[in-house]
Amino acid sequence: MYKIYIGFDSSNYGQQIAWEVCERSILRNCSDVSQIEIIKLEKKKLIDQGLFKRTDNDGATEFTYTRFFVPYLNNYKGHAIFVDSDFLWECDILDLFKIYTNPNSAVSCVKHAYTNCNGKKKMDGQAQEWYPKKNWSSLMIFNCEHPNVVKNLTLKAANTKTPKWLHRMEWCQEEEILEIPKDYNYLVDYYDEGDIKALHYTDGGPWHPGYENVTYGDRWLKYISEDEKKKIKWSIENEYN
């Protein structure tokens, strides 16, 4: 059974439905859903369980740090995927497990190299700023059994290490980061047209103010009902500052 952890943000209806759409798109395109288990990665649940103890509140979403709890939650066994909730899958996610993993790699991800983000806004309204390995951690296949994951990405480390150390994957060696083609983490409005396998609305999706007509937003909207569209409209008008 392959486990897929989708980051969950409870801050408003739009963020919550984004999680639902991500899950729906994975299930719709998966060749064998009996092989996968999708897990809602909730910060509140981790807090209630006494696992999440970070006190810094500088994350853009509730899953800014929870993603690094995945190896622990997976009992340091096998491979597990973490993905941001603002993804829309258009391929069989099982391919990632079958093609882009190996025993020598600690983690697999798309190694984005773009720098044209300055001046744009994050989904929470904060300014987008470039930094090394930006967006690499938005989709990760953890090799939960890898020695450096077991040794370095402990529960204590997930709770105490700096954002830089965590997101820049300083918990493993550079040669232990296996590259996935960018089509699996296609950054909307940053990349040219390609063989898109998973859309990532990194600046904002149709559930965000100002992004109602975002590129490829029509594909995302196909996954929701008319009633959900009305609720998103209400959320955009009432739940964002």
Residue spans for each PLM region:
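Hydrophobic beta-strand segments of well-ordered beta-sheets in folded domains
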Residues: 1-4, 105-107
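A glycosyltransferase accessory/donor-loop signature
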Residues: 2-16, 20-21, 37-45, 139-241
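Generic detection of long, well-ordered alpha-helical segments
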Residues: 12-16, 82, 90, 130
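Short, acidic, metal-binding catalytic loop of nucleotide-sugar glycosyltransferases
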Residues: 25-33
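Active-site-proximal specificity loops/subdomain of glycosyltransferases
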Residues: 35-73
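Short, surface-exposed amphipathic charged segments that create phosphate/polyanion-binding patches used
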Residues: 51-58, 121-127, 194-196
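GT-A fold catalytic core of metal-dependent nucleotide-sugar glycosyltransferases
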Residues: 66-117, 141
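Conserved catalytic core of nucleotide-sugar-dependent glycosyltransferases
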Residues: 99-164
